[in-house]
Amino acid sequence: LKCHNTQLPFIYKTCPEGKNLCFKATLKKFPLKFPFKRGCADNCPKNSALLKYVCCSTDKCN
């Protein structure tokens, strides 16, 4: 699986074994949905008071 791992959409990395999801975190209160953090995960992180997480399982989907 290949996931973006920076705020720039053309930079990505291959996820290590066992990390089968890509995630993207955006700031909930910020009007633009600019990615705050991206990367690989084994489980989808839980939303927090400040961050909303979206997970997916195909190459470069985050």
From Swiss-Prot:
Purpose of the protein: Potent inhibitor of human Nav1.8/SCN10A (IC(50)=141-380 nM). Is highly selective for this channel and acts in a reversible manner. Shows a depolarizing shift of activation and hyperpolarizing shift of inactivation. In contrast to the very similar cytotoxin A5 (AC P62375), does not seem to bind integrin alpha-V/beta-3, since it does not promote or inhibit the proliferation of HUVECs and C-PAE cells. In vivo, in rodent models of inflammatory and neuropathic pain, it alleviates nociceptive behaviors more potently than does morphine.
Family statement drawn from the similarity comment of this UniProt entry: Belongs to the three-finger toxin family. Short-chain subfamily. Orphan group XV sub-subfamily.
GO CC, alphabetical: extracellular region
MF-aspect GO terms: sodium channel regulator activity; toxin activity
Note: Is classified as a P-type cytotoxin, since a proline residue stands at position 52 (Pro-31 in standard classification).
Protein name: Mu-elapitoxin-Na1a
Pfam families: Toxin_cobra-type
Subcellular location: Secreted
Disulfide bonds: 3-22, 15-40, 44-55, 56-61
Organ and tissue specificity: Expressed by the venom gland.
Listed InterPro entries: Cytotoxin_Cobra (IPR003572), Snake_3FTx (IPR003571), Snake_toxin-like_sf (IPR045860), Snake_toxin_con_site (IPR018354), Toxin_cobra-type (IPR054131)
Keywords: Disulfide bond, Ion channel impairing toxin, Neurotoxin, Secreted, Toxin, Voltage-gated sodium channel impairing toxin
Keyword Disulfide bond attributed: yes
Gene3D superfamilies: CD59 (2.10.60.10)
Naturally occurring in which organism (per UniProt): Naja atra
